[in-house]
Amino acid sequence: MKTIRLKYLTLLVIAAASLLCGGSTFAAILPYPNQIEWRPGVFRISEDLRVYCDSFFKNEAQKVMDKLSEETGLTYRFVDKKDADILASFSENVKPEGYTLEISESEVNVGASTQAGLFYAAETLKQLIQRANGDCCIPCVYICDFPAFSWRGFLLDEARNFQGKAEVKKLLDEMAALKMNVFHWHLTDDQGWRIEIKKYPLLTEVGGRRDSTQLNWYESCVYDGKPVSGYYTQQDIREIIAYAADRHITIVPEIEFPGHASAAIAAYPWLGCSGKEISVPCSYGVFSSVFNIADVRVQTFIRDVLDEVSDLFPSEIIHIGGDEVKYDEWQNSETIRQFMKDEHLLSPAELQIWFANYLSSYLSRKGKVMMGWNDITGDKIHAFQPECKVESRLDTRNTIVQFWQGNPEILGKTLERGFKVVNSQCDYTYLNYNYDKIVPGLEYGHTPIPMEKAYSFSPVPQGLECRPELVLGLTCAMWGEWINRSEIMYRMVYPQIAAYAEVGWTLNENKDFDRFLISLNGFKERWRSAGYIQ
């Protein structure tokens, strides 16, 4: 009853503020703040906003006010503190990325301890501004806000289908508005290599192209016959990194090792175990091609790639993939079998653990942290994997595990071992599981994820008592199979991404699905205007 009363009291206050401002509706806030106290009255916005900020925020304040002016049409100027009606102050007691926002009838006060906190305060402020009948105002309110999780991520797979710079920037804009802060960029896979590596130009010249694309579904023999290409130059990537940084988004690149390697092996056949020349696959699915990680030349290649990627991306974290490795080619390779014998490895699963530790150690020496899908821990999580003896252990010291597949007990065991974890449990966070929305009646093999289920997701599962502080947060994933047009991607991403944004930001005790649906209306209007949803 208390929750219901608070919900309707909040809506009444919003409605009252709207009436004071002369309108009939008022935009709610999303993701919802973790502490909010609505107060009577409104702050009426003059045509010329007078702004003061502490020197700590000088550059950030300029950027957020420019953006606010661009999006609302309001003008502003910086003034002395005594003359200001919007004041931004450094407040060391505010949590990282958090902010305070106090709006009275006479002024707006913002407090933050980080540049990101000021940025997020501005995003909230933009949602509070109401225009009606020629008037512009903000309801009086006190907000003390901070994220539930430090990692609030979105994954875009461009290896399967290249989207391009403009689309990536649009996604980054929406992530920023939703206070999401990690863009996980899946740049290589069987169907394409999308990042320029200067030392190995064939990765993009050959691996960045394919002759056609499979249509309908995995078992289909129908192809569109249209060549596909596209990749990012290193200059393109620097531009996108800078664009993301302006929005307080870290880009974590993913380069797939040792599986999902067909595009790379098509470019340089000596990277593989079979010795055969292959083409970049035109179909989707899990392929057998894997890197011959026992070959010194292949190890050098991998280090060279990681060197260029590490130099290019400021992110402390480099994602090495590691998922869905089929062991057939390793088991059939004399070189691999001898290497396993020399290294006293009992199974292909132990070989993968050895390789992950090798990459983790190398990246550590470069000042980077390795991240990989939870396959790298050696747990059996796929039906196609044989039962393997596993006595080796993945080193916890420089490794983040991204959990996507398996039961909660596997996640619990991973945390018990001391790994930091990002939770991307596929049955809750995969945006592509809703593909039947685009093609009605499609037999995908996965249960679609309705909005309410997405919203119910908790990065720390209920009943999991083991070291919840090691759960950094979540990443929702837009995998790229069948997403050959941006319009399809929009339909998959929006509005579902908003649920994951609130999962990452709003504490469980402050979540309310009915209230969330009301808050979502403002973003739906924004996305309709942009042409993302109907």
Segments and roles (model prediction):
Residues 26-149, 477, 488, 504-532:
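Contiguous, structured surface segment used for ligand recognition
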Residues 94-317, 358, 362, 475-480:
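Feature activates predominantly on carbohydrate-active enzymes
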Residues 264-269, 279-399, 404-413:
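Active-site neighborhood of glycoside hydrolase catalytic domains
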Residues 1-28:
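Bacterial Sec-dependent N-terminal signal peptides
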Residues 370-375, 380-534:
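Flexible, acidic glycine-rich loops studded with aromatic residues
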Residues 59-60, 162-164, 190-196, 258-264, ...:
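Flexible loop/turn segments at secondary-structure boundaries
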